């Protein structure tokens, strides 16, 4: 307890525990909203940078920082059928399309000799008993000259009729999904990404612990005490040095300001280059550095009072440092 008589809450939130590195550079999503419309529940885009705009919100001119995302089309490369067992979904069958770009084989080499027609019959026979259907999508970073190896992940389909969802998933095989097929302007989405990695950091930067006085014993940038149980048994709430950043994080209810043509600043975006594909403007900030994949999900708990953007008066295209 502090001895100065003022309120001093403990440092760091146990809501973000354990503070360890994410298992991969793009996130896995386990929680999805339920909607009636039959459509994919998520999309993916690459973070470009930030700029500022002047928006007309509820009749007022509002200076608003926005994040720019580049969203090339997603390629639907397969479908998966799931069965509920003991309260969890278990995969019972999967199907992949046969005519795919060569870059997809970097991620899944076994698809080079995949017999689509034979696997399709097996998939349909097992999918009749499915409780859930998801599509398997691949990003296409080569279309925006970002890199060659794609990210591959599953996206659930909205709706309650499994047969209709299965039919919809099969109709998408081998086709491309655009951002306009999933989201629209003025809609709220959740953004899920892996944050910037900071490496191994001390308690001052990691937990914002105050520096000790200059005459303190055995160090200044350290915690004063680690508990009464001794160094052999330390509570998990005690600030300790360790990994900072590169964590999977979710931010709720980001407003889509605009979906449109490529948006470039003078001289190109710093540490990114020129935007080639469709652009998304999101109100506020987004986790992760430039070029990182951001998953946009249907808002799982949208706000009751929703802002209405009546127009965009100005978008800053000045060089960004």
UniProtKB/Swiss-Prot annotation:
GO cellular component terms, A-Z: cytosolic large ribosomal subunit
Keywords: Ribonucleoprotein, Ribosomal protein, RNA-binding, rRNA-binding
MF terms in GO: rRNA binding; structural constituent of ribosome
Keyword Thylakoid in record: no
Pfam families: Ribosomal_L3
Gene3D superfamilies per record: 3.30.1430.10, Ribosomal protein L3, domain 3 (4.10.960.10), Translation factors (2.40.30.10)
Name assigned to this protein: Large ribosomal subunit protein uL3
Species whose genome carries this gene: Nanoarchaeum equitans (strain Kin4-M)
Gene name, Swiss-Prot/TrEMBL: rpl3
